[in-house]
From Swiss-Prot:
Cysteine-cysteine disulfides: none
Taxonomic placement: Eukaryota, Metazoa, Chordata, Craniata, Vertebrata
Protein family membership: Belongs to the TALE/MEIS homeobox family.
Residue ranges with Polar residues bias: 203-213
The protein's name: Homeobox protein Meis1
Subunit text: Interacts with the N-terminal region of PBX1 to form a heterodimer which binds DNA including a cAMP-responsive sequence in CYP17. Also forms heterodimers with PBX2. Forms heterotrimers with PBX1 or PBX2 and a number of HOX proteins including HOXA9, HOXD4 and HOXD9 where it acts as a non-DNA-binding partner. Also forms heterotrimers with PBX1 and HOX proteins including HOXD9 and HOXD10 where PBX1 is the non-DNA-binding partner. Heterodimer with DLX3. Heterodimer with HOXB13.
Organism, scientific name: Mus musculus
GO biological process: angiogenesis; blood vessel morphogenesis; cell growth involved in cardiac muscle cell development; definitive hemopoiesis; hemopoiesis; lens morphogenesis in camera-type eye; locomotory behavior; megakaryocyte development
The keyword DNA-binding appears for this protein: yes
Length: 390
C-alpha cells in the first residue's frame, strides 16, 4: 500500500498538509534563498507555481539530495503511522460512495456507509491495541492523521446525506405521480368513448334501413322548412323536428322511433346514459354550436378548449375527444356528401361549395340543397337529430 500511494502525485511533498519544517530538523532551510529576478518588475517567474523546481535549480546538488531525503522520511513516517490503514480505509469508502451504484436489495451495498465505518473503527482499534499503540512518538504527526481521518469522515457523511436526499426526492416524486394522475378516470373515459363509438357506428349503419313512413315524413318536413320540394325518390332530407330523438352527445343519434313505455322511465334513461358515458345535453349543445360556427376550421385552440371546458363543465380531455369524434362523424360526412354532389354535376361556386351551400333551417338543422336540374332532389346525410344544437 505504501508503494501505491508513493506513485500518486499528490503525495509528492508535505508542504500542502501542514507539517512544519522543524518537525524533522530543518532540511528545507535552503528554500529561504530568493530566486534570481530576471525582470525589475512583477512577481518572480514561476516562483509560486513551481516552487520545488525554482529552488532546486538554484540549489547545489547536495542540497537537492537532502530535500529528497527529507521528503522520503516524511512519506515513510506517514505510511508507517499506526493510523494510516484506517485513513486508507475511509478514503476507499469515500471512493466507493461516489462510484458504486447503490442497490438496497443487494447484500453488501452498505459497505461504504458511515455506520459501517464506525464498525471498522471499533475492529481496527481492538486489533491495533493488541499489536502496537495507536499513536507514534510524534504528536504533530498524530494530530495530522486524526484530522485527515476526521475530514474524510465528514466527507463520507455528506455523501450519505446526498444519497438520502436523492432517495427521498425519488420517493416523493413517484408518490406524487401516482396520486395526482387520474389514471382510472382516463381509462374509464377511453373505455366509455370506445363503447359509444361502436354503438354510434351501428346506429349509423342502420340509418340506411329507415321505413318508408319516416322517409315521407322527412320529405314533408324539408318542404315546409326549406321551401324546396324533395321527391320521395331522392335521398333523405334532414329535418328540424323530433328533438326528443337526441340523446347525450348527439354525435350519432338514432332516428325517431315510436315511443314505448320503457322510454318514459327516467331511471332507465339515466342508467342508459350513464352506461354509455354520454355528456350532458347542455354541454353538447355548446360544443355543437361552436363546431357549426367554425366549420371551415373545426379545430379549437388550447385557449378555446379551456373556455369550452369551463362553459360545459367538462374536462379539456373530454372536450378534445368530443371534437375529434365530431370531425370524423359530422364534418367528414358533410364533406363527402358535398364531393358526391359535385361529382354528379352540381354547379360549383368559387368558394368550393355547391351553389346550394349548407342551408340552416332556422338554425335547427343543416341540409345540402342542389339547385338546377337536381332541385327536386333533397340531400340528406343520414344524420337526423344531430343539428339541434340550440
Amino acid at each position: 500500500m505504501a508503494q501505491r500511494y508513493d506513485d500518486l502525485p499528490h503525495y509528492g511533498g508535505m508542504d500542502g498538509v501542514g507539517i512544519p519544517s522543524t518537525m524533522y530538523g530543518d532540511p528545507h532551510a535552503a528554500r529561504s534563498m530568493q530566486p534570481v529576478h530576471h525582470l525589475n518588475h512583477g512577481p518572480p517567474l514561476h516562483s509560486h507555481q513551481y516552487p520545488h523546481t525554482a529552488h532546486t535549480n538554484a540549489m547545489a546538488p547536495s542540497m537537492g539530495s537532502s530535500v529528497n531525503d527529507a521528503l522520503k522520511r516524511d512519506k515513510d513516517a506517514i505510511y508507517g503511522h499506526p493510523l494510516f490503514p484506517l485513513l486508507a480505509l475511509i478514503f476507499e469508502k469515500c471512493e466507493l460512495a461516489t462510484c458504486t451504484p447503490r442497490e438496497p436489495g443487494v447484500a453488501g451495498g452498505d459497505v461504504c456507509s458511515s455506520e459501517s465505518f464506525n464498525e471498522d473503527i471499533a475492529v481496527f482499534a481492538k486489533q491495533i491495541r493488541a499489536e502496537k499503540p495507536l499513536f507514534s512518538s510524534n504528536p504533530e504527526l498524530d494530530n495530522l492523521m486524526i484530522q485527515a481521518i476526521q475530514v474524510l469522515r465528514f466527507h463520507l457523511l455528506e455523501l450519505e446525506k446526498v444519497h438520502e436526499l436523492c432517495d427521498n426526492f425519488c420517493h416523493r416524486y413517484i408518490s406524487c405521480l401516482k396520486g395526482k394522475m387520474p389514471i382510472d378516470l382516463v381509462i374509464d373515459d377511453r373505455e366509455g368513448g370506445s363503447k359509444s363509438d361502436s354503438e354510434d357506428v351501428t346506429r349509423s349503419a342502420n340509418l340506411t334501413d329507415q321505413p318508408s313512413w319516416n322517409r315521407d315524413h322527412d320529405d314533408t318536413a324539408s318542404t315546409r322548412s326549406g321551401g324546396t320540394p324533395g321527391p320521395s325518390s331522392g335521398g333523405h332530407t334532414s329535418h328540424s323536428g323530433d328533438n326528443s330523438s337526441e340523446q347525450g352527445d348527439g354525435l350519432d343519434n338514432s332516428v325517431a322511433s315510436p315511443s314505448t313505455g320503457d322510454d318514459d322511465d327516467p331511471d332507465k334513461d339515466k342508467k342508459r346514459h350513464k352506461k354509455r358515458g354520454i355528456f350532458p345535453k347542455v354541454a353538447t349543445n355548446i360544443m355543437r354550436a361552436w363546431l357549426f360556427q367554425h366549420l371551415t376550421h373545426p379545430y379549437p385552440s388550447e385557449e378555446q378548449k379551456k373556455q369550452l371546458a369551463q362553459d360545459t363543465g367538462l374536462t379539456i380531455l373530454q372536450v378534445n375527444n368530443w371534437f375529434i369524434n365530431a370531425r370524423r362523424r359530422i364534418v367528414q360526412p358533410m364533406i363527402d356528401q358535398s364531393n358526391r354532389a359535385v361529382s354528379q354535376g352540381t354547379p360549383y361556386n368559387p368558394d368550393g361549395q355547391p351553389m346550394g351551400g349548407f342551408v340552416m333551417d332556422g338554425q335547427q338543422h343543416m341540409g345540402i340543397r342542389a339547385p338546377g336540374p337536381m332541385s327536386g332532389m333533397g340531400m340528406n346525410m343520414g344524420m337526423e337529430g344531430q343539428w339541434h344544437y340550440m
